[in-house]
Amino acid sequence: MADRYPGYDVLDKWDSPSFDDVTRDVLTDRLDRIPARRFLDEREWALLEAVVARLLPQPDRADPIPVTPWIDRMLAEDRGEGFRHEGDPPMRALWREGLAALSDEAPGFATFAAEEQDALLGRVQRGEVQSDRWRAVNPKRFFAQLLRAAAGIYYAHPAAWNEIGFGGPANPRGYVRLGFDERDRWEAQEAHDG
């Protein structure tokens, strides 16, 4: 991936007015306090790792952003979005059933070539599944839940912020320049071709 924000590192703002103590504590958690496995079993964890690696590939990253540990923590603490679709099982059961159905749909998913994994995930996303295990959970909704959780966790990490030029929460510094094509001096400068 091309570096759209060359030289930008949001963590350079650590001791600046851009970050307050609460922000620094949250970022310390995301960077240094990666949760241990508490909810998923080893097979579920390995499958989720393989799925996340296809949804959010990180081939050029020396230290990939950890996503599975944070999903596992969310499940262990039973912290969801505060709603569920009619007919869906509770969140933890949804994840267990969804991962079991995915495993049944494609035994050995983690060993498949990337193209095969992507094709299978596309079928799940479209609801074009074969396994009877999907009767317990809607494949389209499970895929949407999986993608939302994975992307939300990924883009909560400072390394992902660097990729998109995000400077972190606006408090306490706030935004001043709000006009078209204006940016505050603390915002990342995007590289332009030519």
What spans do the regions from the language model cover?
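Intrinsic disorder at enzyme termini
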Residues: 15-18
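Functionally engaged cysteine thiol sites
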Residues: 20-21, 178
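Mature-region segments of soluble proteins
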Residues: 1-13, 26-33, 43-50, 54-194
